[in-house]
Amino acid sequence: MTANGLAQPTPAVRAKGPPVWLDMDQKELDDAYDQFVYAPNARQVIARCHRNSELVRERLGAPKRLAYGPTPIEALDIYSAKTENAPINIFVHGGAWRAEVAAGNASQAEMLVNAGAHLVVLDFNNVIETGGDLMTMANQIQRGVVWVYKNAKSFGGDPERIYISGHSSGGHWVGVLLTTDWQKDFGVPPTMIKGGVAGSGMFDLKPVRLSARSNYIKFTNEAEETLSAQRHLDKLVAPVAVVYGTAETPEFQRQSRDFAAAVQTAGRPASLSVMEGYNHFEVWEQLANPYSVFGRAVLNQMKLRPT
């Protein structure tokens, strides 16, 4: 009842449409691939992550900025360990494939540097800049990783201890990198990457292609097939750690669970860690915390301890 005694109007109930993916209709699927629907504090957490990256640079100093390719965006930031021949963690940022840059994704640098590792954060074109083409992005990221392997010694890194991590669409790229045929496509050892941590990623692009994300991504059969890591587990040779939060969208939770299970079924080493009560963006923020599930997964895989 309202203050004047009149009955409140009953909210209209949305009629459910035909199923598009599993039991979800189009709106439900679109929402399941829109993290902002499930994270009301998203913009605040994103702002904190960006600010924390700035604070880390104030404490550690500016990273080395080196080019891995011919275009201005094809560069990477190196936050250097204090010891020579140190292990390397390459981070691939998220942003729904269309946002974010390396500078705003360095809050975990202090954790890794203090633990004795280099952090390398890749920059690359977003999907808007590539005209909707994910394959171009994939090639840039792959070339960035190859550059790190070939040039590791030049910045005091150990090319035999390269690990990767990523969150959101960066978690998707971790899956792609772990299932790349490095010998065939780039002429480098298939065991170049020693392990990967995929936070809140996507590993089968079919439902993503059916969602509203296809409004800005030009999904092709080639892109869907090539960039769906779960379909290429025969190429997976490194351990993978999968992390997600229970307050993420149902599809992001399912994607992580299904990928970890598929890797284990294929006889490859995989772990699944669940962050109870964390939404998508809060999972990202916790990467900088060495005692969080996400931060610990990265350190443990590299056999490092927080300091």
Feature names for model-found ranges:
Residues 2-307:
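Alpha/beta-hydrolase superfamily serine-hydrolase fold, recognizing
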